[in-house]
């Protein structure tokens, strides 16, 4: 029974029994405390907690889940998987144990012909909570299960709780006896390898109190309404019903695993190390496909990092098995989409998008590996040469900091060389870097003063009242003066000063908007030029500048005035940022979320999440859409409301940003609506013009758009027009023909480069004749081994091997082994003729001998194969081992 059919039968059975079928929720959890949905009941959690009224009394679903806690264990056993599907039925105060237990039994034991799963009742066991006599009685008297197949367990195994405090209750688990060949008799309490859990029925009837661990907490009392939450793992159920040993042999994971084996020239079940890699690949490719389909994008934080990590683990295991730098993820993703597509048709509909994102990450990681592996290999050699067994924490940090190697990748690679990593030093260096970055960020906010200085001013004078949304100047009272990091009563001409006022029109730098500049004037006595405004602690505005003339004293009444021209220019940039954000989301989809911004006078930059660059058409589309909104002169409106109400209105919030209960919404009449505390124009037409300069990468999965606004944009358009005119004159072509003229020049350049490449390859192949003449005899066989110059491509190595093999003829067995370092990893190619194959030699086996010496693997056809590894110092040894194998055959 296929996995899709198991899911269909489950839903159909419960729908027939009065349950509403609820589609799987996205893997991106609504619950802010969860990174990803990790259990079937997560979408229903608000109903169980009483936060929302359920729209139905009964529900059933097949929920997509990702568990991140044991990703490192995936592949090492056949039980662990990062993605799984949970079949469940739920009751919200409707039925309880008396119905949940018989329903489960009915579905399991009803024949396949009648819509059930056809389990033999004699092979089913159950466990109940130690004191749950009610459940035991239902199993015994209503279902008819013999007493000896009902086992009792304690709180740690058969009592479930949601949170602290929160609903909890006993559970009853149903197990399938796989037979004596899998272990000892005695039921689940004796052997959970033989007795597999297939279904867990949770009876939520109590509320728990504070306490640690699975057992040490009090029961506060019974819930007003009792609920049912059940969970059946689809993958495990599929393994049982399909008659296979484990989930990696089922119709979904098994397909991906078999294709991975084909692509890498390996056979599942022959080598445990290779089997682990194949299981990692199968699981992680499926998980990545499902995450991308639900809108997760590779990144360096939170769920984006989970996706990046599993993608990189699968890519690296693919390369370990294949021994080369081939790109296989596209092929495997296609298999995953097809394997899961019957259950989730959206995978096929979004196939192009899924491929694009995963392919881009594979390419990015290939570049990362290529750049960092040389340093890694050098560090490994240095460690081993000194007799060490621990990979340097400093080297691990450099790999992370310079090449983007996550620590888990370094741990895996080091373990393959029999080394541990000095994680303590690595984490110390990471912490030092974080502290340095934090100090640098705080230095701007704190200036020369200690945080306590600002704390005292806030405590005595209260928070600063911000008037800048409506006023560009105001009267204010000086609450505090700081010079050289110390509070003082006065500041005089020439002093670098920090002023704290009771109220201010000055905007303090925040939300990507630069601070206002201007003047603070003491009537008839002094002037301070304000160059920066910061909020070192929440609520306190600190004006930094220089006393230009006279003096300023605590308790002075001053006149604070901002530079209105600068404010207007910065406000135009900030409003343009909102418009660009909306245009990007309209062009790329909602995954193009804000990752950062900076709004300067006449100029802005906007960072957003995306896995691929914007092409010229997309940039033009964004620019045109923004300027069309400017032409409509949309009024910009502002609203202060609660966070919940703002989100209900559809206002965008920046992920990870901390908001108070009261927030400010900047609304550009349906086109753009965001939470924002910055300053903006009154209507979009005031921006004048927005010119997008281009886009670039600022990190993996994050792109940056830069743009000019207003007069700065107009000046750039004029400059570019003049530049086009100059090019037209130099290339002797009208403006409209410039693209064709430039294309022609580029084509000629590329043709010249190809000719250079052809000549270089020919130079490599010139050695073929001499190599054939240097063949060494081993019995009736001839062998040629040769190391090419570093930088010779793997393709040229294959051509050379085939050329030499052809020159050796077919009159007797001939073996050619060519090795080199195309970039930073060693590669070996073995080509043999038909006579050698008839003599029992196989190119794949010979490559395997060499690749293992290099610390990797490989495969290919019987007549030619390619492999590789990570140890460039072992190339000569690898070639010698190939020759020895031929000599001994």
Curated annotation (Swiss-Prot):
It comes from Thermobifida fusca (strain YX). It comes from the Bacteria. Its EC number is 6.1.1.7. Disulfide bonds: none annotated. Zn(2+) binds at residues 574, 578, 676, 680. It is found in: Cytoplasm. Its cofactor is Zn(2+). This is Alanine--tRNA ligase. One of its GO terms (molecular function) is tRNA binding. The lineage of its organism: Bacteria, Bacillati, Actinomycetota, Actinomycetes, Streptosporangiales.
């Amino acid at each position: 029974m296929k996995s899709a059919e198991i899911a269909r039968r489950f839903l159909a059975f419960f729908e027939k029994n009065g349950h509403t079928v609820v589609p799987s929720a996205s893997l991106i959890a609504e619950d802010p405390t969860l990174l990803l949905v990790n259990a079937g009941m997560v979408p229903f959690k608000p109903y169980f907690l009483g936060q929302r009224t359920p729209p139905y009394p009964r529900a059933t679903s097949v929920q997509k889940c990702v568990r991140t806690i044991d990703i490192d264990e995936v592949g090492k056993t056949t039980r662990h998987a990062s993605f799984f599907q949970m079949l469940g039925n739920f009751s919200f105060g409707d039925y309880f144990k008396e119905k949940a237990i018989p329903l489960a039994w009915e579905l399991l034991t009803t024949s396949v012909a009648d819509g059930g799963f056809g389990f033999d009742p004699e092979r089913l066991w159950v466990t109940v909570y130690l004191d749950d006599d009610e459940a035991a009685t239902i199993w015994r008297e209503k279902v008819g299960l013999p007493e000896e197949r009902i086992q009792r367990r304690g709180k740690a195994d058969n009592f479930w709780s949601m949170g602290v405090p929160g609903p909890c209750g006993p559970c009853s688990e149903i197990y399938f006896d796989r037979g004596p060949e899998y272990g000892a008799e005695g039921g689940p309490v004796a052997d959970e390898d033989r007795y597999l859990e297939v279904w867990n029925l949770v009876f939520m009837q109590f509320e728990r109190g504070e306490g640690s661990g699975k057992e040490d907490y009090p029961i506060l009392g019974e819930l007003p309404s009792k609920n049912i939450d059940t969970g059946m793992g689809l993958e495990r159920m599929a393994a049982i019903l399909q008659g296979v040993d484990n989930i990696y042999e089922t119709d979904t994971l098994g397909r991906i695993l078999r294709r991975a084996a084909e692509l890498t020239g390996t056979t599942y079940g022959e080598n445990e190390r290779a089997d682990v890699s194949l299981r990692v690949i199968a699981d992680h490719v499926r998980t990545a496909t499902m995450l991308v389909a639900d809108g997760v994008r590779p990144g360096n934080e939170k769920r984006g990092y989970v996706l990046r990590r599993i993608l990189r683990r699968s890519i690296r295991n693919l390369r370990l098995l294949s021994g080369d730098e081939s790109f296989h993820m596209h092929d495997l993703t296609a298999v995953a989409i097809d394997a899961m597509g019957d259950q989730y048709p959206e995978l096929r509909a979004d196939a192009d998008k899924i491929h694009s994102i995963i392919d881009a990450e594979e390419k990015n990681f290939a570049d990362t590996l290529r750049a960092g592996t040389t340093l890694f290999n050098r560090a490994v050699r240095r460690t081993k040469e000194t007799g060490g067994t621990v990979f340097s924490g400093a080297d691990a940090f450099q790999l992370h900091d310079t090449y983007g190697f996550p620590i888990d990748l370094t741990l895996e690679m080091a373990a393959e060389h029999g080394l541990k990593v000095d994680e303590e030093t690595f984490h110390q260096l990471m912490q030092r870097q974080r502290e340095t970055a934090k100090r640098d960020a705080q230095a701007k906010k704190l200036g020369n003063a200690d945080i306590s200085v600002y704390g005292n001013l806030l405590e005595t004078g209260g928070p600063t009242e911000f008037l800048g949304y409506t006023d560009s100047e105001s009267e204010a009272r000086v609450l505090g003066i700081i010079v050289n990091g110390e509070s003082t009563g006065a500041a005089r001409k020439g002093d670098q000063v920090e002023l704290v006022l009771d109220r201010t029109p000055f905007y303090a730098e925040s939300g990507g908007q630069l601070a206002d500049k201007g003047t603070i004037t003491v009537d008839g006595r002094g002037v301070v030029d304000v160059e920066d405004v910061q909020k070192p602690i929440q609520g306190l505005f600190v004006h930094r500048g220089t006393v230009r003339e006279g003096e300023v004293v605590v308790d002075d009444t001053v006149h604070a005035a901002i530079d209105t021209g600068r404010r207007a220019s910065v406000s135009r940039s900030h409003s343009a940022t909102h418009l660009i954000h909306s245009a990007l989301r309209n062009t790329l989809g909602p995954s193009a979320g804000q990752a950062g911004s900076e709004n300067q006078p006449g100029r802005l930059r906007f960072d957003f999440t995306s896995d691929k660059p914007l092409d010229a058409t997309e940039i033009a589309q964004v620019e045109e859409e923004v300027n069309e909104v400017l032409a409509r002169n949309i009024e910009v409106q502002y609203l202060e409301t609660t966070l919940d109400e703002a989100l209900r209105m559809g206002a965008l919030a920046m992920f990870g940003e901390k908001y108070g209960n009261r927030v400010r919404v900047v609304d550009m009449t349906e086109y753009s609506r965001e939470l924002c505390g910055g300053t903006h124009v009154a209507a979009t037409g005031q921006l004048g013009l927005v010119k997008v300069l281009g886009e670039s990468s600022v990190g993996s999965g994050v792109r940056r758009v830069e743009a000019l606004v207003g007069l700065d944009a107009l000046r750039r358009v004029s400059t570019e027009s003049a530049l086009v005119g100059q090019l037209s004159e130099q290339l002797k072509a009208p403006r409209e023909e410039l693209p064709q003229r430039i294309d022609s020049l580029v084509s000629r350049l590329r043709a010249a480069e190809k000719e250079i490449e052809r000549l270089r390859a020919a130079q490599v192949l010139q050695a073929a004749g001499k190599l054939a003449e240097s063949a060494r005899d081993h019995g009736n066989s001839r062998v040629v081994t040769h190391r090419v110059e570093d930088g010779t491509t793997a393709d040229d190595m294959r051509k050379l091997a085939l050329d030499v093999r052809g020159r050796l003829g077919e009159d007797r067995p001939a073996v050619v082994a060519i090795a080199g370092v195309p970039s930073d990893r060693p590669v070996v190619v073995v080509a043999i003729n038909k006579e050698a194959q008839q003599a029992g030699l196989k190119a794949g086996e010979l490559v395997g001998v060499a690749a293992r010496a290099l610390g990797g693997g490989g495969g290919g056809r019987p007549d030619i194969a390619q492999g590789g590894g990570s140890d460039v110092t072992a190339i000569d040894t690898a070639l010698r081992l190939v020759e020895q194998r031929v000599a001994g055959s």
